[in-house]
């Protein structure tokens, strides 16, 4: 991706005794049950002392969700064009009613929090999630642990975290997770490459599409003609913004004038989440934001909103990312809860996100919870699209569980079964897989039914027998689902025209295509596409051009982010093959065909 991989810059691991003072201590009476813990402390971190007892920490508590499996099956059903309930998206009220936990569960957790000094009136309840703010002193007593300041020895950033936390046994059956506690992370843009010299072009007429990509190149390659989405509030295109990436209106306006003059005057709205800003005169890096708005909106022409979310996440560091910030807020949860709290009429129809992180760098309870929230967006008719990543088979190529096993690294959220993951290609005539396109198989999520036949075919007939055994999970969710161009996109940023590469070009590109397909459906009185994958792997598959040349790479012996030494795997790669493959998915879009297929159901 020029995607922001919430990438985990690496960190070798040291044993727990190296930081025993950070380990949880049973310091209050009563029985507790450990909810989450880290196996080891990452190298590159030092304990710098204890936070002030009065320091404020904001927590999100996820209640156990006994109806998750039934709900997710319902989302699959309403997204399956062969099912009688296809297209019957749920309202906000229907989702909340379906997932509302039993009153005794919520009451028990409320009472537990109140008994530990957290006033009930300060606890915000949102279906099966609770949000509360408390002091370090109270949090330590509540969670039977000790919080410490940790400093990263690479960039000197600090964070307040613990290695383990517990909850009272009386409420343990009701609490799924509480964060931020053990999730150390810092999202960062994963720039596959940004060409620092200015592009000597002023319009699409100056471009060789084998060298530089513009909207006209994409329209020609994917047979889009001059079709744009109508500006319809039912078909809003949402673009995720994190990490103080500001989408500049002047740059966007110039890009449209240069490359899509038929959309002259088109702009986008901005919505702030958790205090997020969209400063127009900042000197901070904004290539990711510029790329996203230029191509998602420049291709679709849809009514669009840039969602700027403040805060940075926390991670279980691995060889990609020992990079942490002192901000306690996790952007995915902040954004997801904001969006799910919107009335149905204000939800985006398509949400494009060009960010990701190594799946292993995120606690399992967290990936499960976040993926389920993506399913809730799908239930309400939102197509959630993520770039697959820019590390090929992997960059760290080592487990971070203390065992240091050499393996490929799947990407989250790209490997969540309820998002559509977009890989990367380059060149035209023929279009081929690009080497950095991330793909593979989840170690957290099992393979969903909609891709069972395709992935099994790849494993049994296209992948050399025994190749890469032990390096990946052959029963995991395969990604990406589809792919699109990802190399040297002409982009306006800070008043310059530059070239940018990454699957974070592929994601907004594909989001623009989906937005136009939604517009076609709405014009024919059909519902929005919503969660795409069951449709893509059934009806939609014939609307994609199979990419059979090229492949990914990775595991080169040097981490591409931290530049630390990593395991070297000679020839590490997934090849583009006939049918689905873990580099390009089902292939690249043929809009001419898709525009007809989209009206069949």
Curated annotation (Swiss-Prot):
Cofactor note: Binds 1 Ca(2+) ion per subunit.
Active site, per annotation: 288 (charge relay system), 292 (charge relay system), 504 (charge relay system)
Cofactor: Ca(2+)
UniProt GO BP: proteolysis
Signal sequence annotation: 1-22
The keyword Signal is assigned to this record: yes
Gene Ontology annotations for the cellular component aspect, listed alphabetically: extracellular region
Keyword Hydrolase (UniProt): yes
Gene3D superfamilies according to UniProt: Peptidase S8/S53 domain (3.40.50.200)
Residue numbers binding Ca(2+): 546-547, 579, 581
Main location: secreted
Role, per record: Secreted tripeptidyl-peptidase which degrades proteins at acidic pHs and is involved in virulence.
Designated name of the protein: Tripeptidyl-peptidase SED4
